[in-house]
Amino acid sequence: MEFFVENINLLLFLPLIVCAILGFNGLISNRVEKNTLFSISIAVALICLIFAGAAFDYSVFNNMSVSSNFPWLALDNINFYLGTYLDKISVSFLLGSGVLCVLLQVFAFLKLKDTPDFNRLLLYLNLFYFALNGIFISPNIFQSYLFFEIVGVAAYLLINFDFSNRDESKAAIKSFVFNRIGDLTLLFCVLTILYYAVVYNQLTDANSLSYTNMNNVSASINSLMSEPLFVFFCSILMFVIVMKFMQAFIYLTFEPKENTLLSKVILFQNAMITLAGVYLFMRLNPFFVDLGFDWVWTLLVLALMFLTLGVLNKLFIPFCKMMGWIEKYVVESVINFAELLIRAFSYICTKLQAGNFQSYLIYSLIGLVLIFAFVLIFYVLLIKV
């Protein structure tokens, strides 16, 4: 039992290894059969489930917890830590997500194994499983934020799996934007908590953002902030959690008219992000407990935030159309410019060296290098401006 708990980090590395195998198989033109790759993937998922079950028995039935931290990024007065934290909450979510991920992979194999890009689907599912495990074993809110970003990327890739489908592409873009809004808001909350922990409490060690110290951090922030400001901050925390709950509903609004098996897999995967929202709510519960009867004001602020988001959403669609037109114009202009340069250099080589293949290739490469240099210079100047 202790072996599984001491090596619980394998819950992160094993799905990543499967992703590497699937990615390498794509580089060698999918020479490995789908059945073999699925066998590897489901075996790893079952091994991870065994680790999660052992951790569940260790923390729930034996009433024990495990915590480890190591410095990852050190600044002048701020240190960021990564590590592992297992308690009753984390192991419960690990076990639940492990069971659901195994069922999802089995369903995808039974129903979608004849899909030409099934290996890519399997890669995205393992990437999502890796990120979900990372959220649940994180010892602090900063590490959870990092894995929330990976969850957002995996969700975008899965929704946009059939990128030739315009409905799926629209759903992927909207899901990605909503994820970025939620994750950037979470980053704001992380930096706010870190500011109060470091500046006012002089916490520069692993306790500054640790879940084990969240009660003290919440009480300290509540005492330092004014009452309206604390209500607003808790409203932002609740906004982040609600955005995670809305992930499945966002996909439902853009779900394709044909209810395919792939859309069911994607919907089930998006619904699993709700687990991450529940987990975040339980970890940040000390802030909501300290609100007391100010919950009414929190709900009012939350409603105003979503009203603002709805207005921005109405403006977002025309903005996307405009940016799509600009992007198309820029891409076509660059392609035409590149073609013009290559033709010019090929003409020069025919005049100077009789147009043999080697000279044509050399001058074409020179033209491409000049194009890349032009784009790079333009990009640098644009940043400076």
Language-model features and meaning:
Residues 56-83, 150, 164, 168, ...:
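Juxtamembrane/interfacial segments at transmembrane-helix boundaries in multi-pass membrane proteins
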Residues 10-28, 41-54, 97-110, 128-129, ...:
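Central hydrophobic cores of alpha-helical transmembrane segments in multi-pass inner-membrane proteins
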Residues 66-163, 182-184, 256-260, 264, ...:
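Internal transmembrane alpha-helices of multipass membrane proteins
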Residues 77, 269, 311-385:
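Aromatic-capped, Gly/Pro-kinked transmembrane alpha-helices
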Residues 32, 124-221, 309-310, 314:
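Alpha-helical multi-pass transmembrane bundles of energy-transducing inner-membrane proteins
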Residues 1-13, 34-39, 79-96, 134-147, ...:
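Membrane-entry segments of alpha-helical transmembrane domains in multi-pass membrane proteins
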Residues 33-47, 173-185, 359-365:
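Alpha-helical transmembrane segments and their helix-start/interface "positive-inside/aromatic belt" motifs
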Residues 1-10, 20, 24-123, 197-224, ...:
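Transmembrane helix-loop-helix hairpins at membrane boundaries of multipass inner-membrane proteins
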